[in-house]
Amino acid sequence: MLEPDDIALFRGAVKGVKALKQDKFIAPRQKMSKKKSTLRDIREKEDTLFYFSDEYEPLLNEESAVRYLREGEDSHILKQLRRGDFSPELFLDLHGLTKEQAKIELASLLQACENEHVYCASVMTGYGSYILKRQIPRWLVQHPKVRALHQAPKAWGGDAAILILFEV
């Protein structure tokens, strides 16, 4: 609390000050309603979810480290991802989520990366029963904005995480 001397000093400093009457300025109404905003977000997520098919089986080597490079990209990018030269700006932790919940969260991450112009993100799948660890790369390779992905280096999660490089 304040000391009595401090209170007296403050009162002496503001003595004679009059409160302003607010009658001239009217705050502008907010242009966009919350309904429209959430509707737009839902549409963007649906657009992103469009790319995630559970039936698609890409040619990924599931016995070694997870990695993918989009056709036409420089192979040096995979080496940079493996070494941790790209540091992720956004992180997504999927521990404890179901496959459907993970798909929605992954779509949200991709949309956030696109909206915020983020070029690298990390998805933590965890160890668990390996369902998400196998499925996440299958979904990611279907998205046109994903340039490359690789199992994260130990500093960013190791076996339990995937680094993703996006087209910005």
Curated annotation (Swiss-Prot):
- State the EC number(s): 3.1.-.-
Q: What biological process terms from GO does the record include? A: rescue of stalled ribosome
- What keywords are annotated for this sequence in UniProt? Endonuclease, Hydrolase, Nuclease, RNA-binding, rRNA-binding
Q: Which residue intervals define the domain Smr in the entry? A: 92-167
Q: Which cysteines are joined by disulfide bonds?
A: none
The answer to keyword Nucleus applying to this record is no
Q: Per its record, what are the GO molecular function terms?
A: RNA endonuclease activity; rRNA binding
**Keyword Transcription regulation annotated:** no
InterPro entries in alphabetical order: Smr_dom, Smr_dom_sf, SmrB-like
Top-level taxon in the UniProt lineage? Bacteria
What does the subunit comment say?
Associates with collided ribosomes, but not with correctly translating polysomes.
* PANTHER family in alphabetical order: DNA ENDONUCLEASE SMRA-RELATED, UPF0115 PROTEIN YFCN
Reported function: Acts as a ribosome collision sensor. Detects stalled/collided disomes (pairs of ribosomes where the leading ribosome is stalled and a second ribosome has collided with it) and endonucleolytically cleaves mRNA at the 5' boundary of the stalled ribosome. Stalled/collided disomes form a new interface (primarily via the 30S subunits) that binds SmrB. Cleaved mRNA becomes available for tmRNA ligation, leading to ribosomal subunit dissociation and rescue of stalled ribosomes.
Which family, according to UniProt?
Answer: Belongs to the SmrB family.
HAMAP family annotated for this entry? SmrB
Record's protein name: Ribosome rescue factor SmrB
